[in-house]
């Protein structure tokens, strides 16, 4: 079905479903990558003196794409409040240590990923999200040059 577009506002509205889906796909990629590195973090060290809660492993969250003031937005984040039951340490501190490759503030394993930094390196910094966006737009019939 053809849409009549008379101005830039009409064009922006017509493009919103495509942009929303593209942003949701990009957020999914970041979320999957974050969960991959969260799992690698847990796999890198097996605690001897305590039993794991697994709250940090399940602390990654994704908010589906939506249109806000004419723009498609989505969120992927580590929920610090989700880790509120750690003894004597905040969720913020747990996430900070994990991003420094530390377990409980200590360097206990040589192969511990820096969870958030490696997520960004493998999605944003390496251009994967841009490639995914271009591929999606092309699949929708857009001509895209990078």
Go through the PLM ranges and name each one.
Residues 1-77, 95-146:
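Short, Lys/Arg-rich flexible segments
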Residues 71, 80-92:
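Short, surface-exposed beta-strand/loop "edge" segments at domain boundaries and coil↔beta transitions
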């Amino acid at each position: 079905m053809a849409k009549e577009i008379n101005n830039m506002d009409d064009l922006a509205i017509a493009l919103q479903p495509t942009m929303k889906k593209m942003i949701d796909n990009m957020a999914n990629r970041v979320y999957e990558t974050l969960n991959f590195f969260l799992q690698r973090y847990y796999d890198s060290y097996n605690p001897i003196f305590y039993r794991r809660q697994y709250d940090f492993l399940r602390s990654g969250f994704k908010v589906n794409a939506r249109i806000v003031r004419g723009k498609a937005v989505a969120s992927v984040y580590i929920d610090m409040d989700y880790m509120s039951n750690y003894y004597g340490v905040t969720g913020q501190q747990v996430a900070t240590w994990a991003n420094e490759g530390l377990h409980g503030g200590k360097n206990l394993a040589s192969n511990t990923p820096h969870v958030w930094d490696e997520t960004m390196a493998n999605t944003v910094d390496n251009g994967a999200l841009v490639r995914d966006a271009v591929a999606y737009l092309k699949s929708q019939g857009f001509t895209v040059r990078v």
